């Protein structure tokens, strides 16, 4: 429910709808969400007709913005579209008779990263942060009696201490900021006292309800990283009633680190959401991740970063770069691994 991710989800839903009816659609869709309003913009080349207002409202409703007090509500918000035709100058460099030889939709560098510290080969701190928010959303949508005050907007962050060999030692800090209903002030206490009681209640629920549910999802060696010394920051400003697009304008593509590796590896700067596969910002980053993940899963290295770069209108990448951070398990240099990747993938 974070505003930037609301925008990302709307952009991706529009992309999905175009591709569902025309698999060759070329889409670059941007979304802005703010108080009571959604603005759609971008470039599209497609034979499909999409009711963009309906798609946007369905996404907003599914996320949970369904109450007027949020000042951003699925049925009543305005949806303004300024989507137009894709540039012919770009399209002529992308489309080919052979679809497997289409040109890249833009220039740039893309990175894929993998590590064996989790079962899905994602960095542990990022994976834990995602799990916290997935579980918080699950409680809000399907087990609301556990934390009935939850609203859609939320963020999390996890800090992990590592040893000199890159192995996680313990979880140092967990940050959870979650939007919530206004708590009713009891008679005889001030608003400030009520707010403090509210913050204490939410912090207790995060520690006693949310954390155990997230911890239980992980294998024993990850569970062992949870300890009594973890520093918790739960709604550290003290109050989070005003949130969502009303509290913070959201834009597509502003959470690129959350969407990738949480600061590990590297990033070329291009966002994913709202872009069809001809946009190498997305497809090449996915391909680089696929390569890194499979090589780490195969035991080639404990950790791997794969970088590719493209020129607009050119089908093949200009280069492949590999960094195993000194954690390779084969008698090959990173350059030799890169050469194997070029021949195999």
Question: Residue locations for each model-derived region?
Answer:
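N-terminal, positively charged regions that mediate nucleic acid binding
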Residues: 2-28, 143
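Conserved phosphate/anionic-ligand binding catalytic regions in large, soluble enzymes, centered on
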Residues: 2-7, 103-118, 241-266, 270
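A short glycine-rich, hydrophobically flanked beta-strand micro-motif that places a catalytic Asp/Glu
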Residues: 27-29, 154-160, 230-234, 301-311
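Short, charge-patterned binding micro-sites
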Residues: 28-46, 312-316
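Internal helix-turn-beta structural module
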Residues: 34, 303, 309-345
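Glycine-rich, mobile lid/loop segments that gate access to catalytic sites or pores
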Residues: 36, 54, 58-242
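C-terminal catalytic subdomain
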Residues: 254-256, 261-305, 316-323, 327
